[in-house]
Amino acid sequence: MDATVKKMSPETSRPSREEAENAVRTLLRWAGDDPSREGLLDTPKRVAKAYGELFGGYNVNVEDVLGTTFEEVGGYNDIVLVRDIPFFSHCEHHMLPVIGKAHVAYLPNGRVLGLSKIARVVDLFARRLQTQETMTAQIADSLVQYLQPRGVAVMVDAEHMCMAMRGIQKSGSTTLTTTFTGEFKTDVPQQVRFMTMVQNR
């Protein structure tokens, strides 16, 4: 899977804030409401501001988050797992929320990451229009590229509002995706250890 998000070409460059706000007004009219009524006067401005935050992952480079690693301390070479990382994303098909948790592990190969950076890389990819499958692969691929560990394991468990709020309307159902690389991919007992560590409370 090609998990790379390519930059916009000059022909599809980012519109201005004013254009974004006008687009919100158009959607409000299309939905059947009046963007000039009192309760909606500031809505286009608020939506544009919210989108800047919700999709802030487009403004962050992976290298800025994972570009600095540390030499291993004390010879530790077993699983490093950060579990239950909460995230909010939006599906690229309907632009509706995806709410879930990510569990990310790696096997060190001489270098380690600050633990907060694992959570930050989850947020980086979550704050973009996504499919859950792509996001899972992107997290793993970025750790492989910048940390070069012996293996990476990523599990994402999320509820998709496009299933809960529209269409089939099955609230409470979740989707589970996993990606394994290196020793986690070739060594089944390591996969089992990862799954057990994620599930144990």
UniProtKB/Swiss-Prot annotation:
Superkingdom: Bacteria
EC number of this enzyme: 3.5.4.16
Molecular functions (GO terms): GTP binding; GTP cyclohydrolase I activity; zinc ion binding
Keyword presence, Hydrolase: yes
Pfam families for this protein: GTP_cyclohydroI
Similarity comment: family membership: Belongs to the GTP cyclohydrolase I family.
Designated name of the protein: GTP cyclohydrolase 1
Species assigned in the record: Allorhizobium ampelinum (strain ATCC BAA-846 / DSM 112012 / S4) (Agrobacterium vitis (strain S4))
Gene transcribed to yield this protein: folE
